[in-house]
């Protein structure tokens, strides 16, 4: 599946509560990006993603996959948390290298399952060699995501992976 696992649809739509009309716009953006689904990862707000998922499932017959999540701070790092089926939680460090003072290596522990390798908002601040080395050392999944703050940016970067593979990594 083509999945963009780091998006901010509330900011992208300027709506803090999703409606059927707003979700229709999100679905159109996901499809325009050639994706099968997205992770909705608002800053400190997991409820938005769950509400979008509920509307997609109820009103749009599950037309796209929606993985609810949130982006939180862990020290100076930004951690993206995805809430997968069967209460499985997958966590990855978003845009390592931003903020610049973040100590990536010290933020990697057993709760982290992946590292974002590509992110169009922060590629200039990310050290690909270091990210790849740390991913290999810690057996972490490398991900590419848009970090979209506008609907038109959804799918600019994405990861090809099955949800089952994310679940297996997180167990």
How should each PLM-predicted stretch be described?
Residues 1-5, 9-19, 24, 28, ...:
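Charged catalytic cores and adjacent phosphate/nucleic-acid-binding surfaces used
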Residues 5, 41, 70, 94, ...:
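Active-site flanking residues adjacent to catalytic metal/cofactor-binding acidic residues
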Residues 66-72:
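Hydrophobic/aromatic-rich structural module bridging two neighboring secondary-structure elements via a short loop
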């Amino acid at each position: 599946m083509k999945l963009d696992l780091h998006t901010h649809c509330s900011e992208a739509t300027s709506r803090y509560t999703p409606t059927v009309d707003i979700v229709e716009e999100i679905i159109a953006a996901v499809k325009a990006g050639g994706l099968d689904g997205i992770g909705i990862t608002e800053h400190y707000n997991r409820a938005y993603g769950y509400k979008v998922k509920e509307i997609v499932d109820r009103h749009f017959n599950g037309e796209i996959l929606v993985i609810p999540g949130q982006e939180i701070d862990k020290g100076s790092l930004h951690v993206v948390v995805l809430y997968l089926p069967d209460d499985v939680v997958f966590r990855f460090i978003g845009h390592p290298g931003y903020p610049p003072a973040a100590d990536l290596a010290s933020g990697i522990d057993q709760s982290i399952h992946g590292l974002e390798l590509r992110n169009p908002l922060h590629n200039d601040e990310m050290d690909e060699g270091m990210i790849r080395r740390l991913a290999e050392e810690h057996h972490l999944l490398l991900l590419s995501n848009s970090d979209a703050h506008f609907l038109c940016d959804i799918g600019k970067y994405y990861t090809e992976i099955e949800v089952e593979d994310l679940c297996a990594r997180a167990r």
